[in-house]
Swiss-Prot record:
Protein's UniProt name: Flavonoid 6-O-methyltransferase 6
GO MF, one example: protein dimerization activity
InterPro entries registered for this protein in UniProt: COMT-like (IPR016461), O_MeTrfase_dom (IPR001077), Plant_O-MeTrfase_dimerisation (IPR012967), SAM-dependent_MTases_sf (IPR029063), WH-like_DNA-bd_sf (IPR036388), WH_DNA-bd_sf (IPR036390)
First-tier enzyme category under EC: transferase
Organism taxonomic ancestry: Eukaryota, Viridiplantae, Streptophyta, Embryophyta, Tracheophyta
E.C. designation(s): 2.1.1.-
Length: 336
């Protein structure tokens, strides 16, 4: 079918767009000596054993191994990790030292992964900007313009996916707040498709101050950790993956306070990492995004369905539903 072909092409495009992260993940594994450790051990190792042997904390190591197993580098059985014929070729007696040549400060990408960064929790990206907060550093105006343009383009694509694949998303909704919506490109597209909805873009005051006018959209400045404007629905598009679990719970509680108890909903538009043995065309791209979050942030990550459910329960939501919109994200509707 034509639609299926379009989805496949979209998934392939995402894979290409995120492809830079894969070799840096393999570099990080070689830096951590994972192929050699598994080879010397002579058999499978648990996550705890591998963490102790590499000096890498369990969570980043788990995420790294999940990604590399998906790509066939290592294997996993009964919650233990093992060599594959391919991973054996990355020991130091084989191509391991060649990989390390690509992982020197002169050759590695500052937006890539490294073994040392995984151990310390300080991504190379943050070191490359002198440990400062890149989002607020005026010296990185060029980067921020590129970031804003990329997020604008992405939000339009995601909004279009909602319009096409979730046409009932705003049934019974008269107003929606787009938290962290920057200049309103996503909510503008949604209001255009669902004209009975009043859109509110909510972001930091300095961001909404520069936003051009949009038909059907109001702009409100503020802090999502303090309060969120009242509306029938609150949308969080590619917001929560930037934050730790504790911060996500804070944000979700503020969003819950902003909606009607009986009829409101919070729409989380974010990736859901597939469980082992499950997946679709976008599974690889979602795992690549998780590696990029690990490479460029200290808190961000893509979450599995179980991890999302944990956050919703902790934030006090009573029920939820998940809609596949045939792109890299899903829509999770959470109800008070």
């Amino acid at each position: 079918m034509a639609v299926d072909k379009e989805v496949q092409l979209h998934a392939q495009a995402w894979d290409h767009a995120l492809s830079y992260i894969k070799p840096t993940a393999l570099d990080a594994a070689v830096e951590l000596e994972i192929p050699d450790i598994l080879e010397d051990h002579g058999g499978p190792m648990s996550l705890s054993e591998l963490s102790a042997a590499t000096g890498c904390p369990r969570e980043p190591l788990y995420r790294l191994m999940r990604f590399l197993i998906f790509h066939g580098i290592f294997t996993k059985s009964d919650d233990c990790y093992a060599q594959s014929p391919l991973s054996r070729l990355f020991t130091r007696e084989n191509l391991g030292l060649y990989m390390l040549m690509q992982a020197t400060p002169a050759t590695r990408s500052p937006a890539g992964l490294s073994g040392e960064a995984l151990k310390t929790g300080t991504p190379l990206y943050l070191k490359s900007i002198r440990g400062e907060d890149s989002w607020n550093d005026p010296a990185y105006g060029f980067h921020m313009r590129a970031f804003t343009n990329a997020m604008t383009a992405h939000s339009r694509l995601t909004a279009a996916a909602i319009v096409t694949n979730y046409p009932t998303a705003f049934d019974g909704v008269r107003s929606v707040v787009d938290v962290g919506g920057r200049h309103g490109m996503a909510i503008g597209r949604l209001v255009e498709a669902f004209p009975w909805v009043r859109g509110i873009t909510f972001d930091l005051p300095e961001i909404v101050a520069d936003a051009p006018p949009l038909k059907g959209v109001d702009f409100v400045g503020g802090d999502m950790f303090k309060s969120v404007p009242k509306a029938d629905a609150v949308m969080l598009m590619w917001i929560l993956h930037d934050w730790s679990d504790d911060k996500c719970i804070e944000i979700l509680k503020k969003c819950k306070e902003a909606i009607p108890t009986s009829t409101g909903k919070v729409m989380i538009v974010d990736a859901i990492i597939n469980e082992e043995g499950e997946g679709d065309e976008f599974s690889g791209a979602r795992l690549s995004l998780d590696m990029i979050m690990m490479a460029t942030t200290t808190q961000g990550k893509e979450r599995s369905y179980k991890e999302w459910v944990h956050l919703l329960n902790k934030a006090g939501f009573s029920k939820h539903s998940v809609k596949n919109i045939k792109t890299i994200e899903f829509v999770i509707d959470a109800y008070p």
